[in-house]
Amino acid sequence: MNADVSAFNLVKTTTIESLNIQYEEYEHLTTGARHIHLASDNNENVFMVALRTVPTDSTGVAHILEHTSLCGSKRFPVRDPFFMMIRRSLNTFMNAFTSSDWTAYPFASQNKKDFNNLLEVYLDAVFFARLDPLDFSQEGHRLEFEEPNNPDSDLVYKGVVFNEMKGAMSSISSQLWQAVGESLFPDTTYGVNSGGEPENITDLSYEQLQAFYQTHYHPDNATFVTFGDISAKEHQFKIQEFALRHFAPLNKRIEVPLQDKFDNAIRVTKQFPISEEEAKGDKTHLVMAWVLGNIRDPLELMSTHLLSAVLFENSASPLQQALETTDLGTAPSPLCGMDDSGLEMVFVCGVEGSSEDKLEQLEALVLNALQGVADNGVDTQRMTALLDQLELQQREVGGGGYPYGLQIMLSCLPTAIHRGDAAAALNIDPILTQLRESIQDPNFIKSLVKRLLIDNQHRVSLVMTPDTKLSQQRIEQEQQKLAAIKETLTEEEKQNIITTAAALKERQTVDDDPEILPKVDLTDIPPVTDIPEFSEQKMAKRSATFYPQGTNGLSYQQVITQLPTLNEQQSALLGIHNRVLTDLGVGSKDYLATQNWQTQVCGGINAQSSIRSDLNNEQQVSGYFTLSAKGLNIHNNA
C-alpha cells in the first residue's frame, strides 16, 4: 500500500472544530489531482469526484456526458450500473450532479465493503466510460421517424436530456435565471445553459462529446473529496489502483475566467412563452441583478451572505418588505437572494406579476431601499441575530435528504473547484469572529451595501414579457428544421435512423449479467442496528423525550400533538393552517416582530401534520400536528 500512497503529497492539514473534522488536503504527484479528506468519527463514509466542466455553448455537452458516463464502463460494461448497484448495495446515497461549471459523482454508505464496491464502480464510470454511440443517441438526442419503420413519416427528435430540458426550460424561473446569466456573463460559461437548450442540444455531435470527455474527465482536472472514518491512505490506495495509475499529465488547465466588469448598468428585454388563458392580467417579470465578488475570498463570501440576510431574511427585512408591499407586482420574484454557486456571486431582486412600463419605478424602489440601509444602517442586535443564523447553517447536521458529509462537501465544492482555499470555506468561525467585531461599527453595513450594490455598475435590469405566440413559433421552427433535414437524407441515412431506433429498442430488452458488478452478502451486514438512547422527564405537565446526539452545538425541538378527528372541510384547511401559522404574530408581538424574534433565537419554526399507524396495530391510524424548531444551544432558554 505504501508505494501507491506515496503518489500523493500532503499539502495541508487543519482541525475544523465547529464541524468536528480534520481537514487534510493532498495532491497527486503525477497528474496534479486534488484529494480533500474530511476525517471524522462518522461511519457514514462519503465519496465524491468532481470535475470542472466548462461548456462554451448551450448544447448540454456536460449534462449529456454525465448521463452517458453512467451507461457502462470498461470493467463494468452493463447498460445501467447505477440502477443495478442500488439493488446490490447498502448505500445511503447515490447520484450525479451537473452544475454550471462542475460535474460531481457522489455516494455514501455506512458499510465499508459496500463503500469500496461503489468506489470501484464510480471510478470506472468517470475515468473509463464506454461512451457508446448508441448511449449518446439514447441519453442525448437522435432522429427517429414518427412511425419508427416508416421513412415516409415525419422526423422527430428524441433523447433523455433533450426531453428533460424541454420540461426544465418550460419553467419561468429557469428561463429567468438563464436570462440573468446571459445578461450578466456574456463572455463566460455562466452565459450559456450547461444543462442544454433544447434547440441547441440537437447540434451536439458524438465526436464533440468524446472531445469534451477527453479534456474534462481527466485526473488533472479532478477534485476527489472523502468524508468519514476511513483513512485518507485507504482511499488513496483505491483511487491510485483503480484510476490514477493509468494516466499521464494532460497539461491542460481548465478554469472559468472572471467576467470583465460593466462600465454602466444595462437594461435587457426578453420574452417567455405563455398560453392565451394564462396571459390574462399583468404577467411580466422585472428583476435587477448584480455581479458581486468572487467566492475564493471567504470574508467577502460571508459578508455578502450577511448583506443578503440583512435585505431578505424575512418580511421585516428592508428589501423583502419593500417588494412584498409594493403595488408594482403581485409578489417578490422567485429569484430574490444571493447565489454563490459559481466563481462570482450574483445578487437578484425583483417582482413578478408586473408590467414593462413599471421598470423605472422598480429600480427606484429597490435603490431607495438599499439607500435606506446605507443611510440608517442596521441595529446591532439584528446583525448579531443574522450572524447566529449563518453559524446555525454551518453547524447543522443532516437535513435536505443528503448525508451530513455530503452537505459539508457541497458547501466547499465551489471554492475547491475554482482552486480556492476549501478549508477556509469550511472553517467559518474565524470569519464570524471577524464579522462580529465589524458589525459593532455602524458604518460596516452602510459601506458594504454601497460597495456591493449601490455603486456597483455591473448590473442588469431585466424585463421578461409574456408572449402567447412564442411557444407555437418554437414548435414550428423545430418542425421546419426537421423537414429540412429529411429533404437531404439519402436512402442509406434513412435506413440508419430506422436501424438505430430498432437497436435501442432491442437493447432495452437485453438483461445484463448482474454478477459483473460487485455486491455485499448477508455476512457483510451487521445483525444489529444502532438504536439511539433516550430519556424522559416531565416539562410543563407534559412528558418530554430527550435524545442525546452529536449535533455540533445545535438543539432540535419538536412538540407533537395528536389531532382529533377532522371533518372534510377541516382537513382541507389543515395545510393552509400549517402554512400561515408560523408567519402570524405571537402574544403581544405582531407578525414582523415575531419574525425578528425567530431570527434572534432559532432557525425558524415549522408546522406540519402527518398520519401515522399505531406501533402495535398497523390498521389503526391517527393524525398528528408537529411544531418544530432548531437553534444554537446558547438560545435554549429563549
Enumerate the predicted regions with their spans:
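Conserved phosphate-chemistry cores used by DNA topoisomerases
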Residues: E164-M165, I201-T202
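His/Glu-rich zincin catalytic helix
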Residues: M1-F82, Q110, E120-L123, S170, ...
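M16 family metallopeptidases and their MPP-like homologs
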Residues: E44-V54, D80-F128, D135-E146, S174-E199, ...
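Aromatic-residue-lined binding/catalytic grooves and analogous aromatic/hydrophobic interfacial grooves
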Residues: L452
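Extended serine/threonine-enriched, polar tracts that run as long, contiguous segments within proteins
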Residues: Y206-L209
